[in-house]
Amino acid sequence: MESANASTSATTIDQLCKTFNLSMHTLQINCVFCKNALTTAEIYSYAYKQLKVLFRGGYPYAACACCLEFHGKINQYRHFDYAGYATTVEEETKQDILDVLIRCYLCHKPLCEVEKVKHILTKARFIKLNCTWKGRCLHCWTTCMEDMLP
């Protein structure tokens, strides 16, 4: 894959595929952390989560699901600022909570309205990591709750 054109224009999986006239199913891309090739499911998931493609040494990289979760947990421990309810997020950002881009702190998916409302209804806090508000998506919320059950 010739990288000069891609590194300047492609920032997402979709753009990378368009630049090189590939389908996501045929795209081969490695994880920036562990260097393993992402599975087709991980590539689709990465695109769905609207995560950016990184360029290292002129080549595009993404992150596999395992490394995304691992680095999400590391980020939680290293860069935790504080936690706050939806009202805190709104006061700080001066935006309605539904308009604020909040990602899941484990899988990095942008939270939808339902997930943000669940935080509000259950009085769950959002957390601020490295100056960015994070929460839990429904998938990771369920996974976290399963770990707490006997």
UniProtKB/Swiss-Prot annotation:
Please give the organism.
Answer: Human papillomavirus type 6a
Which family does the record assign? Belongs to the papillomaviridae E6 protein family.
Q: GO CC terms for this protein?
A: host cell cytoplasm; host cell nucleus
* Function statement: Plays a major role in the induction and maintenance of cellular transformation. E6 associates with host UBE3A/E6-AP ubiquitin-protein ligase and modulates its activity. Sequesters tumor suppressor TP53 in the host cytoplasm and modulates its activity by interacting with host EP300 that results in the reduction of TP53 acetylation and activation. In turn, apoptosis induced by DNA damage is inhibited. E6 also protects host keratinocytes from apoptosis by mediating the degradation of host BAK1. May also inhibit host immune response.
Keywords of the record: Activator, DNA-binding, Early protein, Host cytoplasm, Host nucleus, Host-virus interaction, Inhibition of host innate immune response by virus, Metal-binding, Modulation of host cell apoptosis by virus, Transcription, Transcription regulation, Viral immunoevasion, Zinc, Zinc-finger
Record has Transcription regulation as a keyword = yes
Q: Taxonomically, which superkingdom?
A: Viruses
Kindly list the GO molecular function terms attached to this UniProt entry.
DNA binding; zinc ion binding
Query: According to its UniProt record, where is this protein located?
Result: Host cytoplasm; Host nucleus
Q: What is the name of this protein?
A: Protein E6
Q: What else is known?
A: Belongs to the low risk human alphapapillomavirus family. The cancer-causing human papillomavirus E6 protein has a unique carboxy terminal PDZ domain containing substrate but low risk E6s do not possess this domain.
- Name the GO terms of the biological process aspect: DNA-templated transcription; regulation of DNA-templated transcription; symbiont-mediated perturbation of host apoptosis; symbiont-mediated perturbation of host ubiquitin-like protein modification; symbiont-mediated suppression of host innate immune response; symbiont-mediated suppression of host type I interferon-mediated signaling pathway
Give the classification, highest ranks: Viruses, Monodnaviria, Shotokuvirae, Cossaviricota, Papovaviricetes
Q: How does the record describe its quaternary structure? A: Forms homodimers. Interacts with ubiquitin-protein ligase UBE3A/E6-AP; this interaction stimulates UBE3A ubiquitin activity. Interacts with host TP53 and EP300; this interaction inhibits TP53 activity. Interacts with human ZYX.
- Mapped zinc finger ranges (unnamed): 31-67, 104-140
Tell me where it mainly resides. Answer: host cell
Checking Gene3D superfamilies in the record gives: E6 early regulatory protein
